[in-house]
UniProtKB/Swiss-Prot annotation:
ATP binds at K225, G316, E347, G376, G377, D378, S379. It comes from Bacteroides thetaiotaomicron (strain ATCC 29148 / DSM 2079 / JCM 5827 / CCUG 10774 / NCTC 10582 / VPI-5482 / E50). InterPro entries: Phosphoglycerate_kinase, Phosphoglycerate_kinase_N, Phosphoglycerate_kinase_sf. The lineage of its organism: Bacteria, Pseudomonadati, Bacteroidota, Bacteroidia, Bacteroidales. This is Phosphoglycerate kinase. CDD domains: Phosphoglycerate_kinase.
Length: 419
């Protein structure tokens, strides 16, 4: 398999798929440029070799052309980060993109407009009537799949080689993340540095396990984490359940949870997971106490109580001090750690203490030789907020992609390079 380190980009044009899906404020200023910075090593290596770059990315989830999702808003900052004046094409498919790509000289960079302005990027039909028949839907899908081939071929035609550095979209079989790779032979397609690091980190957590292995799963819904939890039960020694999922498990075991978030239709599922953990010899660690509030608000009245004795009208919004200690002790004794999802309602300052404690325990374990992988939107926000990111082994940029990889799924963006 080709690697970016071995490849010489001198005199070559590289199509680089990045994930510049960055948050913008109402004045189109970038509020967090982490994803842009993450791609810099790859982009700078190509330029240092004497290559030129055509950058493809998406921004948001537009259903067509929309100014607020235009990548033109990030050109100035990207130019500053790269130290090169980045050119911009107002399209991906039209004459402007083709002409500018053809004219690129070594050391130059061209940013294409948002790939998702085109239905062909995702390969899903747009603009169907709500009452469209199954036949109409099928015809529209067939049509977009056909035009997707032309779209992909056109993108590939701009470049001599292809670099995928967008782990955040690796779980999507989109035109620019997977299908395009077919137009380049094995020697001319490769992962960027970020993608390489992500793939190695996931591989280490799943296949090169130093024990004890502890996974901390937060988040509000058991239903969205079920496949991950089931896959992890075959791998981990300890599985810590945190966040809103706690109360579904607590209620399933007969506890009183007040008005805490709960998936009533998943109580049997929670019991089944408890049973499976027992059968596999996995230590399933659940909260014993909670920080509860009389309203879903940062300013609500709060108290601590046993997690299964929450009074009516109150809801659990974070773990309590006894649980913090239990979780921290398990984490500190671990040698491989995966953290996905905070322990409480992280958006409210008064309910971040549990997440901070977990983060600090992970940093301590890492100092003592553990490998720690933090991934999935909110847990990444946690370690960044508390200044702990530098103390863990790896912070993943991919939310959904990371979770699907941990579920054991083959990611199309990775498979396309390996083929």
């Amino acid at each position: 398999m080709q690697t970016i380190d071995k490849f010489n980009f001198a005199g070559k044009k590289a199509f680089v798929r990045v994930d510049f899906n960055v948050p913008l404020d109402e004045n189109f200023n970038i509020t967090d440029d982490t994803r842009m910075r993450a791609a810099l090593p790859t982009l700078k290596k190509i330029l240092a070799d004497g290559g030129s770059i055509i950058i493809g990315s998406h921004l948001g989830r537009p259903k067509g052309v929309a100014d607020k999702f235009s990548l033109k808003h990030i050109i100035k900052h990207l130019s500053e980060l790269l130290g090169v004046e980045v050119q911009f094409a107002n399209d991906c498919m039209g004459e402007e993109a083709a002409v500018k790509a053809a004219a690129l000289q070594p050391g130059e960079v061209l940013l294409l407009e948002n790939l998702r302005f085109y239905a062909e990027e995702e390969g899903k039909p747009r603009g169907l009537a709500e009452d469209a028949t199954d036949e109409e839907k099928a015809a529209a899908k067939k049509a977009v799949k056909e035009s997707q081939k032309e779209f992909t071929k056109k993108l590939a035609s701009y470049a001599d080689c292809y670099v995928n550095d967008a782990f955040g979209t690796a779980h999507r079989a989109h035109a620019s993340t997977a299908l395009i790779a077919k137009y380049f032979d094995t020697d001319n397609k490769m992962f960027g540095y970020l993608m390489e690091k992500e793939v190695k980190a996931v591989d280490k957590v799943l296949n090169d396990i130093q024990r004890p292995f502890t996974a901390i799963m937060g988040g509000s819904k058991v239903s969205s984490k079920i496949e991950i939890i089931e896959n992890l039960l075959n791998k981990v020694d300890n599985l810590i359940i945190a966040g809103g999922m706690t109360y579904t498990f607590t209620k399933a075991m007969g506890g009183k949870i007040g008005i805490s978030i709960c998936e009533d239709d998943k109580l049997d599922l929670a019991l089944d997971l408890i049973k499976k953990a027992k059968e596999k010899g996995v230590n399933l660690v659940l909260a014993v106490d909670a920080k509860i509030a009389d309203a879903f608000s940062n300013d609500a009245n709060t108290q601590f109580c046993a997690v299964d004795e929450i009074p009516d009208g109150w809801e659990g919004l974070d773990i309590g001090p006894k649980t913090e200690e239990i979780f921290a002790n398990v984490i500190k004794e671990s040698k491989t750690i995966l953290w996905n999802g905070p322990t409480g309602v992280f958006e409210f300052e008064n309910f971040t203490h549990g997440s901070r404690t977990v983060g600090e325990a992970i940093v301590e374990a890492t100092k003592n030789g553990a490998f720690s992988l933090v991934g999935g939107g909110d847990s990444v926000a946690c370690v960044n907020k508390f200044g702990l990111a530098s103390g863990v082994s790896y912070v993943s940029t991919g939310g959904g992609a990371l979770l699907e990889a941990i579920e054991g799924k083959v990611l199309p963006g990775i498979a396309a390079i390996n083929e």
